[in-house]
């Protein structure tokens, strides 16, 4: 097992030749109380809100890395949070032979978005990683800014990952696309769903990247001319139903 962890970058030999956990290995497989010794500001937070909640109101359910009742590492956090998010995603009935296909491009895009945040977060930064889920959107905010231009990230093909060893580890569990393809893939899936375009916002000092994933169709913009048309349609409907 140590040899395997060494090969994937979770362990490395020290000056005495002994295998020790790397920073990436600690984040992926360690316990929270061990992780915070290396990353004092390390904190993972998942919050669920119901439809009636405003963004300032209290969550209805929560998972945090510091609770002490689970490991608190990013691997376990990934699976706990993904399973919570995925349970609300509708799966169309499709068969592969006699087997039902329960994994859709939307599921894959959600895994990509979650893994991207965990992989590219700056865990030395003083603000933790926060994921918030409402029935109509998911917001993922991680410490650290893009290491490339945002427009380049949206186009794809260019990548400057902060934690390359974490990419390798997530790839071993079939999570994460090839370098530089994550955001374009997510946007493509959202477009095919007919949903509003995902929004990316960068903030600085402290650096923070926030990805908002709408889970609903784009709203039609009504211009001044459109309002007149809508009014005429309403009059026509009332006239139709009164006759």
List each model region and its residues.
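Active-site helix-to-loop segments that bind/position phosphate- or nucleotide-bearing substrates
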Residues: 1-127, 133-138, 146-159, 173, ...
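Short amphipathic alpha-helical elements of helix-turn-helix/winged-helix folds
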Residues: 84, 231-232
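Conserved DxG motif in ATP/Mg2+-binding regions
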Residues: 138-143, 213
């Amino acid at each position: 097992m140590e040899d395997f962890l060494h090969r994937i970058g979770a362990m490395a030999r020290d000056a005495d030749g002994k295998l020790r956990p790397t920073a990436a290995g600690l984040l992926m497989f360690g316990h929270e109380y061990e992780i915070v010794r290396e990353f004092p500001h390390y904190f993972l937070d998942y919050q669920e809100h119901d439809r009636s909640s405003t963004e300032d109101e209290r969550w209805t359910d929560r998972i945090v890395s510091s609770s002490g009742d689970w490991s608190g590492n990013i691997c376990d956090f990934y699976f706990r949070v993904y399973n919570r998010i995925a349970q609300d995603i509708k799966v169309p009935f499709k068969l592969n032979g006699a087997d039902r296909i329960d994994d859709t491009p939307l599921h894959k895009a959600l895994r990509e978005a979650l893994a991207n945040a965990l992989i590219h977060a700056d865990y030395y930064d003083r603000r933790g990683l926060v994921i918030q889920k409402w029935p109509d959107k998911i917001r993922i905010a991680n410490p650290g800014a893009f290491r490339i231009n945002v427009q380049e990230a949206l186009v794809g093909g260019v990548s400057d990952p902060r934690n390359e060893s974490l990419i390798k580890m997530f790839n071993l569990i079939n999570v994460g696309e090839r370098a530089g393809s994550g955001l374009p893939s997510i946007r493509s899936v959202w477009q095919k769903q007919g949903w509003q375009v995902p929004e990316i916002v960068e903030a600085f000092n402290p650096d923070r990247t926030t990805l908002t994933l709408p889970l609903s169709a784009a709203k039609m913009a009504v211009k001044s001319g459109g309002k007149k048309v809508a009014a005429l349609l309403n009059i026509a409907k009332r006239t139709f139903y009164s006759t």
